[in-house]
Regions:
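Helix-helix packing/entry segments at the starts of transmembrane helices
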Residues: 57-63, 134-157, 187-227
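Hydrophobic alpha-helical transmembrane segments of multi-pass integral membrane proteins
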Residues: 1-11, 67, 87-98, 116-123, ...
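Hydrophobic transmembrane alpha-helices of multi-pass small-molecule transport proteins
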Residues: 68-73, 84-106, 215, 224, ...
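Membrane-interface helix termini and inter-helical loops of multi-pass transporters
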Residues: 18-19, 47-50, 103-116, 164-182, ...
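C-terminal-most transmembrane helix of multi-pass membrane proteins
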Residues: 10, 78-79, 179-181, 214-270
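Hydrophobic/aromatic residues within transmembrane alpha-helices
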Residues: 32, 48, 74-80, 138, ...
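Specific transmembrane alpha-helical segments of multi-pass solute transporters/efflux pumps
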Residues: 9-61, 101, 187-205
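Specific alpha-helical transmembrane segments that line the substrate/conduction pathway
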Residues: 2, 46-80, 124, 207-226
Length: 270
């Protein structure tokens, strides 16, 4: 936050930041709801990862696409045409098969149980889907960088309170300087930049399309792990990657055939 707020002020400029902050003051109850679902997503995600096998956790996290598509169909009339298309449904199915192959890499899933950890992962996926729905519903006019920073400003005290109540030890854990540097860089790139771009994309792309493209994350993770960490990329993962890319391409084609004008309409009366 010490970096994000100065960045927002510098990039928006004095005049625009004043106008945008007025919008934030009007929308703060809705931003608080968005921050709450962001907090719940992160809380359930971490709790789930500690309780199930990483492969199972990654697969369960991808159930978010099912929640996102279902909720988008119920809430946004302009996304229903996309969801009804056979090519979209085939693309999603192909992408999910690709995700499964990419994540498992042919490894056995024996030993993984549908226990409390699995429930946490599914709740995390549901919280993320609701988080996405509310972003598109409520804050399309707020600059994405300001929206990201405001939501994190609201959510951060919740994380501190949870940490203290859980009795997990010092609020500031002991770690070497290199670890803190790595955490800072990953936070700025992965959270600051990633969330800002996600906020910016939702009003233009819609929840359904943005969630579908999110299925590429396991593939990118496998590729980066191979390039940077030297982790083995198995042939079955490569096949999964091809299926995933093909499925996402089909989804993209459908999205821009059904909504070629770019920015999607906001539902009326919400």
């Amino acid at each position: 936050l010490a970096i994000l707020w100065p960045f927002v002020v510098v990039t928006l400029g004095k005049k625009r930041i004043r106008e945008s902050l007025r919008s934030v003051r009007r929308l703060w109850p809705k931003l608080a709801v968005i921050a709450l679902f962001n907090y719940l997503h992160q809380l359930f995600l971490v709790a789930g990862i500690y309780r199930v096998y990483p492969t199972v956790a990654a697969l369960l996290e991808e159930t978010g696409i099912l929640f996102s598509v279902g909720l988008a169909y119920l809430v946004f009339h302009d996304e229903r045409e996309t969801i009804r298309r056979l090519m979209f449904q085939m693309g999603i199915a192909l992408s999910l098969v690709g995700v499964f192959l990419t994540i498992t890499g042919g490894q056995s899933l024996e030993g993984g149980e549908f226990n409390l950890g699995a429930l946490y992962m599914i709740l995390s996926a549901l919280a993320w889907s609701l988080f996405s729905i509310f972003i598109r519903l409520w804050i399309p006019a707020v600059p994405s960088a300001l929206a990201t920073t405001t939501v994190f400003t609201i959510a951060t005290p919740l994380f501190f309170i949870t940490h203290i109540l859980s009795g997990a030890g010092s609020v500031i854990p002991q770690a070497p300087p290199k670890m803190w540097l790595l955490l800072t860089i990953s936070g700025l790139v992965g959270i600051g930049t990633g969330y800002t771009m996600y906020y910016k994309s939702l009003p233009a792309l819609g929840v359904t399309f943005a969630s579908s493209i999110g299925l590429l994350i396991p593939l990118f993770t496998s590729i980066i792990s191979f390039l940077i960490l030297g982790e083995l990329l198995l042939p079955i993962q490569a096949v999964g990657g091809v299926l995933l890319l093909t499925g996402c391409y089909m989804v993209i084609r459908v999205r821009f055939k059904t909504a070629p004008s770019g920015r999607l309409k906001r539902p009326s009366g919400i």
